[in-house]
Amino acid sequence: AKEAAAPTTLKGDQVLKDIFYEVKNKLETAIGV
């Protein structure tokens, strides 16, 4: 059923992932991991 989801939902998930990784990278850089 998830495969039949609207393209906008898929795009939204991708945007959230991009934001998540961007924030994660900034945090790791700030912490010095």
Curated annotation (Swiss-Prot):
One of its GO terms (biological process) is pollen development. Transmembrane segments: none annotated. It is found in: Mitochondrion; Mitochondrion inner membrane. The keyword Mitochondrion applies. The keyword Cell division does not apply. Keywords: CF(0), Hydrogen ion transport, Ion transport, Membrane, Mitochondrion, Mitochondrion inner membrane, Transport. It holds the Pfam family Mt_ATP_synt. GO terms for cellular component: mitochondrial inner membrane; proton-transporting ATP synthase complex. Mitochondrial membrane ATP synthase (F(1)F(0) ATP synthase or Complex V) produces ATP from ADP in the presence of a proton gradient across the membrane which is generated by electron transport complexes of the respiratory chain. F-type ATPases consist of two structural domains, F(1) - containing the extramembraneous catalytic core and F(0) - containing the membrane proton channel, linked together by a central stalk and a peripheral stalk. During catalysis, ATP synthesis in the catalytic domain of F(1) is coupled via a rotary mechanism of the central stalk subunits to proton translocation. This is ATP synthase 27 kDa subunit, mitochondrial. It comes from Solanum tuberosum (Potato). The lineage of its organism: Eukaryota, Viridiplantae, Streptophyta, Embryophyta, Tracheophyta.
